[in-house]
Amino acid sequence: MTTPTEFQFTDYQPYDFANRRHIGPSPAEMTDMLKVIGYNSLDGLIDGTLPPAIRQKAPLVWGAPMTEREALDKLRETANKNKVLVSLIGQGYHGTITPPVIQRNILENPAWYTAYTPYQPEISQGRLEALLNYQTMVCDLTGLDVANASLLDEATAAAEGMAIAERVAKSKAKAFFVDADCHPQTIALIRTRAEPLGWQVIVGNPFTDLDPVDVFGAIFQYPGTHGHINDFTGLIARLHQAGAISIVAADILALTLLKSPGEMGADIAVGSSQRFGVPVGYGGPHAAYMAVKDAIKRSMPGRLVGVSVDARGNRAYRLSLQTREQHIRREKATSNICTAQVLLAVMASMYAVFHGPKGIKAIAQQVHQKAVLMAKGLEKLGYKVEPESFFDTITVDVGHMQGLILRAAVAEGVNLRKVGDTHIGMSLDERTRPATLEAVWRAFGGNFKIADFEPSYRLPKGLLRTSDYLTHPIFHMNRAESEMTRYIRRLSDRDLALDRSMIPLGSCTMKLNATAEMLPITWPEFSDIHPFVPADQALGYREMIDDLIEKLCAVTGYDAFSMQPNSGAQGEYAGLLTIRNFHIANGEGHRDVCLIPTSAHGTNPASAQMVGMKVVVVKVRENGDIDLDDFRAKAEEHAANLSCCMITYPSTHGVFEETVKEICDLVHANGGQVYLDGANMNAMVGLSRPGDIGSDVSHLNLHKTFCIPHGGGGPGMGPIGVKAHLAPHLPGHPETDGRPGAVSAAAFGSASILPISWSYCLMMGGEGLTQATKVAILNANYIATRLKGAYDVLYKSKTGRVAHECIIDTRPLVDSAGVTVDDVAKRLIDCGFHAPTMSWPVAGTLMIEPTESETKAELDRFCEAMLAIREEARAIEDGRMDKVNNPLKNAPHTVEDLVGEWDRPYSREQACFPPGAFRVDKYWSPVNRVDNVYGDRNLICTCPPVESYAEAAE
């Protein structure tokens, strides 16, 4: 028994987030791991890994790290500085009700938000089905043939539509027409995209200003930003006669009541699915949609889910037509986009599944009736309301009373839209209550009640929808919440996410997404703020963003940041535009050559071509380093026109190259700028700063280094940091500073997920972030050391170390045992692991990145699985296993394999419970190996017929 005199206070800190929650290995485990690698201390390992020339001089310091509770209190204090008013601003952003069953079971569920992009289809069947539902929903509502699995936002989708039009149009014109009734942010992004490519943008009234022979395409808003509903059928026919492409940007909820773009003859439809249950969140993230005619599906950007079969012939889903994506076609890709908005697309699809066609149509009708009632009240006050026919948006001529009425509305708790100097706009939505209408009437000087008016319709009779939509049974079978909950659970059980096991994907940084970091994103003070509210209503957001920028500057050594890019690829694009604008401002607009090493990520060359640059490829040496002689020769050869180089650091081969400063100096000496891709920043935070080693601009993947979850393939954030001389050329936005160059629909991109990164910084502190980097490097070197002998590690530094990831070579197994990298990846599924990154940056290899969040036990389990796979390959080499009928070739194994007739020359136990696999909580792949060739040859990108569901259940 302890006596009072024996009692001692402990120095153990149970709420130390960095060391007790975020970082996986304990101090004792780190000591053991260091011994395996051959070091006595963590600092010794770091000194042996990073070249001295790139080490930052001063430690990363900012205040004491907060506990989870302290950070949440700070976030609450900051959130309370935002004013949550009812916003009827519209302009593509609308109030919506997120069904609680979707909020709790998807948005707040790590089984959904911690998954990776579904490149491994066998362990992604749940997400893929949800995305197929999304594509079916979009195809039905737009009346078009093929939809992708979402894009970044509506404005980006419109710009991508323009790029498709230029690519596939028969017309040789170099101008694109934009309906003046498009949303301002859409027009801004189209201008940004067109200018460096030399395309003229004509903005005007399509019925008076459009001559189809002058353009390669045109985009129309439906309904328009000010409420007009036009029939574009005739204009579209004229465009087709001239060989031009038609695009309709359509409100997805309005399409339940209005004639679809496909029925008008449109080639492409784009829009946002935000109002299908996704909060506005000060601008995002939201899932944009794109649908196209079948003839142009191969030119569509982004990801496309299709139906295939597995090795048993059962239905299985996969990503289709991947050969058109940037990671394969590089500068010849349809787009640089490698991020969808999967989590948000899943939410939108589940909104449709939950409500069904009757429910969604009823919501649309109610929204329209509210808009009509609003118009009747304003007309009774003597105001002229436009247009005569509308869906949810009206515009009121108020003359010199505009400012007075806008202020009066704010006093009533309502934001209205300022339109020019004499008009006010308002868009009604699902959340609009009778009290809101009465508040607006009071702001206009009226004192009416809803009961004073009879509901009616003001939709154009000639454009009423008569075609069916959402006819597939999936949109009719989950009305009861019990069934909805089970359906969501069934889908999530088919997937492998971070809530089950480590996801060791190289260059992806699948680290912990802590629950405390995730909680604030659904607080109304963050989720219910319209992106275009007056600045004084978003003071909390601005304070948080400013502080996060200050911290990111401290981390990177840059002087300024733009938080606008809402993906890493968008960040690359924005950074290259910033460089281009810098050269133009200096009278050197002719500089258009971009040097890119062959090892670069596919987004790099794709982004360069999007800003009109010419890509010059630089060789890479056998050890993975950039060939300095070739780099020097090409920099000097193109000195007169050199715009920039794009490099990744640490390199895409997982090594800190020692010549990086020399490369930066070479570029600067020849008049160029250095773009350092921040994809691997998780190996640098607190140890090295891009801005100190010669880089001029970088994007950071907040969904990697700073803990925003991958969401199964989005959302992401790719803010760009720049040195001071580039700061004046960062992206502008029409709704904030009015400057050109917008790259995202909202000024701060996907702002509602920024609390995740901010709280991560608050809880880790500078010292904790630095420790996380060190442990990420430790974990990678531990795996590389443990696998040594079984697999070759392709690239190491002169000291024999890797950075935060390593590439192991599985190519020898092809010759010795007929085992491919795909076989290894699928066998890892049997062990309960997502495969590392396959065949990039070197074909036939695996890139492994464990991150700092994984415990030694999990690292050992993974190594045990990899070593066991090598032994299985050795058994094939020695003739102890058949070369064709073996656990590697037949992987992954399913429950159907386990209980079915067994005729294989190895045991069920060996098949289903290899080393590393859990016995009690084993993850079972829901399908056998998916047939990729079949899926592309028999392309089906909407929900299969109901009969196939019945067959699957048998």
Curated annotation (Swiss-Prot):
Family of the protein in this entry: Belongs to the GcvP family.
A GO biological-process term: glycine decarboxylation via glycine cleavage system
Molecular functions per Gene Ontology: glycine binding; glycine dehydrogenase (decarboxylating) activity; pyridoxal phosphate binding
Needed cofactors: pyridoxal 5'-phosphate
InterPro entries per record: GcvP, GDC-P_C, GDC-P_N, GDC_P, PyrdxlP-dep_Trfase, PyrdxlP-dep_Trfase_major, PyrdxlP-dep_Trfase_small
Organism: Rhizobium leguminosarum bv. trifolii (strain WSM2304)
Protein name as it appears in the record: Glycine dehydrogenase (decarboxylating)
Catalytic activity as recorded in UniProt: N(6)-[(R)-lipoyl]-L-lysyl-[glycine-cleavage complex H protein] + glycine + H(+) = N(6)-[(R)-S(8)-aminomethyldihydrolipoyl]-L-lysyl-[glycine-cleavage complex H protein] + CO2
Gene name tied to this protein: gcvP
Subunit structure: The glycine cleavage system is composed of four proteins: P, T, L and H.
EC number: 1.4.4.2
Keyword line: Oxidoreductase, Pyridoxal phosphate
UniProt superkingdom: Bacteria
GO CC, one annotated term: glycine cleavage complex
A Pfam family it matches: GDC-P
